[in-house]
């Protein structure tokens, strides 16, 4: 049974963005080496060898080494690579802000998400109600 990248891919990226977001602000040489090795070995752990090979080519084309000097640099590199992969899959690119907003959305408590959804629906119902009232008023006015 082949593992569908549409299932594991988003989780894999969530994990990689978590790794980038928790990278030391100013890493020492040992940490930079450990993260470099981690990134270089990632293709080995992708469930589909062809995808691993493509990812390997991508990190050869855009090496991580210059971006391991700080957390911000590493976050930007991870975002850049994610967008490059998205482009190769005909998926839309996202800004760093969109990516981070989507990332942190996963940490919202269910109660907060439910309350936001309820408010969104209430706004839609309110707008539809106003539109119906305006249409009715226009109809009655033209009578």
Task: Spell out what each predicted region is.
Residues 11, 15, 34-37, 50, ...:
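Acidic, Ser/Thr-rich intrinsically disordered and amphipathic helical segments
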Residues 6, 10-12, 61-93:
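Charge-dense polyanion-binding interfaces
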Residues 27-30, 53, 92, 96:
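Short, flexible/disordered secondary-structure transition segments
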Residues 116-143:
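C-terminal single-pass membrane-anchor helix
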Residues 31-64:
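Amphipathic alpha-helical packing elements
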Residues 1-27:
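Short terminal alpha-helical segments
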Residues 92-116:
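Juxtamembrane amphipathic/hinge helix adjacent to a transmembrane helix
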């Amino acid at each position: 049974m082949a593992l569908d990248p549409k299932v594991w891919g988003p989780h894999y990226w969530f994990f990689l963005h978590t790794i980038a977001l928790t990278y030391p602000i100013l890493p020492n040489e040992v940490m930079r080496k450990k993260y470099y090795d981690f990134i270089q070995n990632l293709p080995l752990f992708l469930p589909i060898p062809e995808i691993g090979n493509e990812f390997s080519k991508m990190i050869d084309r855009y090496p991580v080494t210059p971006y391991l000097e700080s957390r911000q640099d590493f976050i930007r590199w991870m975002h850049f690579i994610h967008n490059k992969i998205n482009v190769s899959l005909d998926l839309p690119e996202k800004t760093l802000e969109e990516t981070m907003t989507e990332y942190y959305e996963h940490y919202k408590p269910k109660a907060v998400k439910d309350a936001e959804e309820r408010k969104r629906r209430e706004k839609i119902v309110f707008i539809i109600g106003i539109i119906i009232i305006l249409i009715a008023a226009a109809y009655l006015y033209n009578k």
